[in-house]
């Protein structure tokens, strides 16, 4: 990973020349009309080579590209040494240069196919076995609370990757869940979050999972302490904490001081980034909800995508293709966002999850060499499940002044084929219709023909869709653990490839730190009666205008 400015690559300059010269000719209506085989040329199918069978179809024929442009994009990836960077990641080299760390979420789901040398890698299987034994004891009813009752509620207390991943996966895999085991997730430091969650809990039957690598994360530990205080209000004896609290951490002394048994502490390592941690002990809540066998299928699905990414030529490599298309939209067409639009209600947290996954990874303006970039890096990630989004923000995507690339995704088969699959057929008809409408739009001539000669000019103009809005479509058979694992790994690797091309470090998150440091300074001053010192005039006075409670 060179850290070079992408704009210095010869292929980048060639792509800029193509964009400047040929942009007006890149019209999807014309491209489809000129080539009846465009779909077959600009689509790719992924078939897992190991683990549970997974097939994913990627249709990128509705992107603003031609085959020559695609080849230039792949040249760019090769010039940026993406394949070399990929191999370094998989081998355990310290590609997180700012923190001098390996980046080894792939090791958490490695089933002896990759040779990885890094401290802690050999311990992964032991932690997975610990997770299996614990989750099965809770799910079977063998694990009892302090009054001898079984557990029927789990509360995961974490923030960032310790929350977003488990929330997304447990929602996505709800059809595989233990329905009599309720799962809640508390992340926000706002006391409302923990207070409202505790109202749903029975202290005799609730298990709290405290997810913090250092066991010092302010939001997580504050919430955990409040949960412990609530619990002890009923249980009275601190010894009972050990039956109702477990920790996902590496800080043994802090965990045991809290009252959690060391035997109920699940380890992970500093080469696991928070936004890639659902594959680790952070996934304990997932294993509890869907069962360890299904958690393992999730891992195997991701591992098979890892194999695809590591061994498949770029031209047929789904993460590489999606990364290249994103760079073309982002850096040449000037698109600033990417909408993730799953036509599956179970995936309603998918965009939220990859907001962190993408924006925390590639929201950087400095290369690994210390240069300020002169191009756009990571896009803004957002989205919602279809068809909900159609009735809120699709208006702007279709007729707004911004280019918003979109990734549509849908299962061919529903888990809930109610009304003889009527719901699913309607859902899929919208899934197929939206990319077509975005690509081809509706001309003024077509509108006039539809409305007739008596239609007002204002009405005619308002019904014109310019089209030429880029999108990808991802289809898979049915959303199951292995398929979800493959989808997550697909996007992880796409993000990685883009970071390599842009020359940035996708694996630190320094932008999270400054606000946290200032907040700690202000918090210390809020406990005093005098002015908040050392900050700008609005910060100095707002706490007093808001009458901050010092009690």
UniProtKB/Swiss-Prot annotation:
The keyword Cytoplasm appears for this protein: yes
Coiled coil: none
Pfam families referenced in this protein's UniProt entry, alphabetically: PGI
One Gene Ontology biological process: gluconeogenesis
Top-level division of the source organism's lineage: Eukaryota
Record CDD domains: SIS_PGI_1, SIS_PGI_2
This enzyme's EC code(s): 5.3.1.9
Oligomeric form and interacting partners: Homodimer.
Record protein name field: Glucose-6-phosphate isomerase
